[in-house]
Amino acid sequence: MARGKAKEEGSWKKFIWNSEKKEFLGRTGGSWFKILLFYVIFYGCLAGIFIGTIQVMLLTISELKPTYQDRVAPPGLTQIPQIQKTEISFRPADPKSYEAYVLNIYRFLEKYKDAAQKDDMIFEDCSTVPSEPKERGDFNHERGERKVCRFKLEWLGNCSGQNDDSYGYRDGKPCIIIKLNRVLGFKPKPPKNDSSETVEIYSTMKYNPYVLPVQCTGKREEDKDKIGSVEYFGLGGYAGFPLQYYPYYGKLLQPKYLQPLLAVQFTNLTTDTEVRIECKAYGENIGYSEKDRFQGRFDVKIEVKS
């Protein structure tokens, strides 16, 4: 029995290192060198093929503009303050109840302050009235970075924070700031003023062919009587986004780009009642989706507590 164990142990040790044949794990040094060389060459070739494939693919992709944009969804419409569950609830007499909303708006608007738009090499004045889209050449590096239109805080009126640092929340007249999300090369097409839908829209706001209109209304029938009056503050006094701020050329060509903003103030919401509000952009190339609640529109619930 002991002799059998010794024999088994000896064969195991001999497999690891055979001193007679100079073999390690059943292979000589030359054999190990050949097999290692084979795998180095094999995996090196695989890595080369992979890297070559990636390089060829990268040659077809522009770092400035997506090659295919036909399936890019229309831009989303979002509001500031950005809040969870899109619910704003506060008590005007309690600053703590609306502090987070005010701080959110303040931080967002910091880049729109005059001090942040002083550099004339980057920013330019693009008129105080809406005008046609401002083309800035092709999507390439030949002209370097493209200039950006200035957007002045004063155009946001009561919601600019210049005269009321609570953005209306202290008085129970909350403001929200609306923006159209950035989509590379997107040029909004305002609706023509000849359909039944646009006639209804423009019955409550000024029409301009160079403004993409936005309207905020009660979402449900019971909300329409509770929303009260709605005031809009934007460039030129129009309720929408002026076209001269489009198209957007991307972070590489327009790193300091400022989206045009629209401020909306609800001046006499019914108190102690949750009012559901829908804000919606209207345009020929603005779409809506039940799967994406922010595509071209958004809902927000506001409750002003007494």
Curated annotation (Swiss-Prot):
GO molecular function: ATPase activator activity; ATPase binding; P-type sodium:potassium-exchanging transporter activity; protein kinase binding; protein-macromolecule adaptor activity; transporter activator activity
PROSITE patterns reported in the protein's UniProt record: ATPASE_NA_K_BETA_1, ATPASE_NA_K_BETA_2
Main location: membrane
Gene Ontology BP terms: ATP metabolic process; cardiac muscle contraction; cell adhesion; innate immune response; intracellular calcium ion homeostasis; intracellular potassium ion homeostasis; intracellular sodium ion homeostasis; membrane repolarization
Key words of the record: Cell adhesion, Cell membrane, Disulfide bond, Glutathionylation, Glycoprotein, Immunity, Innate immunity, Ion transport, Membrane, Phosphoprotein, Potassium, Potassium transport, Signal-anchor, Sodium, Sodium transport, Sodium/potassium transport, Transmembrane, Transmembrane helix, Transport
Record PTM text: Glutathionylated. N-glycosylated.
Highest taxon of the lineage: Eukaryota
Modified residues (Phosphoserine): S11
Residues listed as glycosylation sites in the UniProt record: N158, N193, N268
Record flagged with keyword Ligase: no
Region (immunoglobulin-like): 191-306
Membrane-spanning parts: 35-62
Pfam families reported in the protein's UniProt record: Na_K-ATPase
Extracellular face of the membrane: 63-306
Residue numbers carrying Phosphotyrosine: Y101
Function (record text): This is the non-catalytic component of the active enzyme, which catalyzes the hydrolysis of ATP coupled with the exchange of Na(+) and K(+) ions across the plasma membrane. The beta subunit regulates, through assembly of alpha/beta heterodimers, the number of sodium pumps transported to the plasma membrane. Plays a role in innate immunity by enhancing virus-triggered induction of interferons (IFNs) and interferon stimulated genes (ISGs). Mechanistically, enhances the ubiquitination of TRAF3 and TRAF6 as well as the phosphorylation of TAK1 and TBK1.
Family affiliation: Belongs to the X(+)/potassium ATPases subunit beta family.
Domain comment, as recorded: The C-terminal lobe folds into an immunoglobulin-like domain and mediates cell adhesion properties.
PANTHER family with a match to the protein in the record: SODIUM/POTASSIUM-DEPENDENT ATPASE BETA SUBUNIT, SODIUM_POTASSIUM-TRANSPORTING ATPASE SUBUNIT BETA-1
Protein name according to UniProt: Sodium/potassium-transporting ATPase subunit beta-1
Gene: ATP1B1
